[in-house]
Amino acid sequence: MGAGTAPKGKRNRTPTHIRCRRCGRRAFNVKKGYCAACGFGRSRRMRKYSWSHKWRKKRNLSY
């Protein structure tokens, strides 16, 4: 099967992301098994990068 319109129609059945148990954001990928926001399921440590300081400062989040 190709990668066109027909396969894309199957993406509406199950959600790609569900609510994360650790951070509470809707960023836990069901297929991959880890959270895109905090890294839960991939590592025990919280996902953090130096380039995301501005975003965290705006939302009053600390490490």
UniProtKB/Swiss-Prot annotation:
Its cofactor is Zn(2+). GO terms for biological process: translation. One of its GO terms (cellular component) is cytosolic large ribosomal subunit. Binds 1 zinc ion per subunit. It holds the Pfam family Ribosomal_L37e. A zinc finger (C4-type) spans 20-38. Zn(2+) binds at residues 20, 23, 35, 38. InterPro entries: Ribosomal_eL37, Ribosomal_eL37/eL43, Ribosomal_eL37_CS, Ribosomal_zn-bd. Keywords: Metal-binding, Ribonucleoprotein, Ribosomal protein, RNA-binding, rRNA-binding, Zinc, Zinc-finger. It comes from the Archaea. GO terms for molecular function: RNA binding; rRNA binding; structural constituent of ribosome; zinc ion binding. PROSITE patterns: RIBOSOMAL_L37E. Binds to the 23S rRNA. Belongs to the eukaryotic ribosomal protein eL37 family. Part of the 50S ribosomal subunit. This is Large ribosomal subunit protein eL37. It comes from Thermococcus kodakarensis (strain ATCC BAA-918 / JCM 12380 / KOD1) (Pyrococcus kodakaraensis (strain KOD1)). The gene is rpl37e.
